[in-house]
From Swiss-Prot:
One of its GO terms (cellular component) is mitochondrial large ribosomal subunit. It comes from Reclinomonas americana. GO terms for molecular function: structural constituent of ribosome. This is Large ribosomal subunit protein bL19m. It is found in: Mitochondrion.
Length: 113
């Protein structure tokens, strides 16, 4: 049973398309996605990565940004086919916590990208 779990983990890490990018909590990211509603169009999203959840088959990140004075959080699965490109723009200053959930209580001027 243990060997099966180890082989599944190795296969999942080899399949990861974005394993070259070393994304950490607190990074400012720019993600390009493809939307397939009526037409195929690309959308560029920017935000602060406030959390990363690593599972056996996939990795999920949470982005937070203020758009038009309203806070917005989005979750993305890194292995999803709708994600075209992930670019690390910068890093926020401050605490070295693993999860940046304290940014939810901060003012919009401190969280704006």
């Amino acid at each position: 049973m243990l060997n099966l779990i180890q082989t599944l983990r190795m296969e999942a890490t080899q399949k990861s398309r974005h394993k070259k990018t070393q994304i950490q909590s607190g990074d400012i990211l720019s993600i390009t996605t493809t939307q397939y509603k009526n037409k195929k169009r690309k959308q560029n999203l920017k935000g602060i990565c406030i959390g990363i959840k690593k599972r056996i088959g996939y990795t999920t990140i949470q982005l937070r940004n203020f758009i038009g004075g309203v806070s917005q959080e989005q979750s993305f699965i890194l292995e999803s086919p709708i994600i075209n490109n992930i670019e690390i723009i910068g890093k926020i200053k401050g605490n070295t916590k693993a999860k940046k959930y304290y940014l939810r209580t901060k003012s919009p001027s401190e969280n704006k990208v």
